[in-house]
Swiss-Prot record:
GO molecular function: proton-transporting ATP synthase activity, rotational mechanism
Entry's family note: Belongs to the ATPase delta chain family.
GO cellular component: plasma membrane; proton-transporting ATP synthase complex
This protein's name: ATP synthase subunit delta
Keywords: ATP synthesis, Cell inner membrane, Cell membrane, CF(1), Hydrogen ion transport, Ion transport, Membrane, Transport
Record gene name: atpH
Length: 181
């Protein structure tokens, strides 16, 4: 689960709208996937794209990325815009937000099922079917194990949360007591 910065979401929306207009969403998504791998490599080396851009000739770095990963012209110009506006540090969040835009466009929602133990594929499939009917769209669920919820489940998707956990019930009970006494 990611809490995204509003700046990253805004940049992702702009990139997505341009990719839709040019009918190159899948190519841009592929470019961003390659850039994500490059950023992971840099992170392992304790470096960031912003740091590399400041150390090297800025144009050479973007040209290197463009040729090494065969980036589309839109992706290349987008990277240059991020660099010009000192927003390269947002790239990983922009990639996540862009993926969310693509999923939304395709009618897919990403959700998280938080449980105290790992659920079976059959159980996840059952709850997925219920919420797909409710949402009227495809749902991709990741099962996250969190022992702190004590028991029950929490289902999160988009901006919604269904908290049916023991911890959630205890906290709701505490809130009611504080309000009434």
């Amino acid at each position: 689960m990611h809490k995204l910065n509003n700046v990253a979401v805004l940049y992702a929306k702009i990139l997505f709208k341009q990719a839709i207009k040019l009918n190159i969403v899948s190519k841009v998504k592929q470019d961003l996937k390659a850039l994500k791998q490059f950023c992971k490599f840099l992170a392992k080396q304790n470096m960031s794209l912003q740091f590399i851009a400041l150390m090297k000739n800025k144009i050479n770095l973007m040209d290197y990325l463009s040729s090494a990963y065969e980036l589309d012209h839109l992706t290349y110009n987008f990277l240059k815009l991020l660099q010009k506006n000192n927003r390269l540090t947002y790239l990983s969040h922009i990639i996540i937000a862009f993926d969310a835009q693509v999923r939304n466009y395709q009618g897919v929602t990403l959700g998280y099922l938080i449980t105290t133990i790992k659920w079976s594929k059959a159980a996840i499939k059952d709850i997925k079917a219920i919420f797909e009917r409710k949402l009227n769209r495809k749902l991709i669920i990741s099962n996250i194990v969190d022992k702190s919820i004590v028991g029950g489940i929490i289902l999160r998707y988009d901006d919604y949360e269904y908290d049916l956990s023991m911890l959630g019930a205890i906290n709701r009970f505490k809130s009611r007591i504080k309000l009434n006494y």
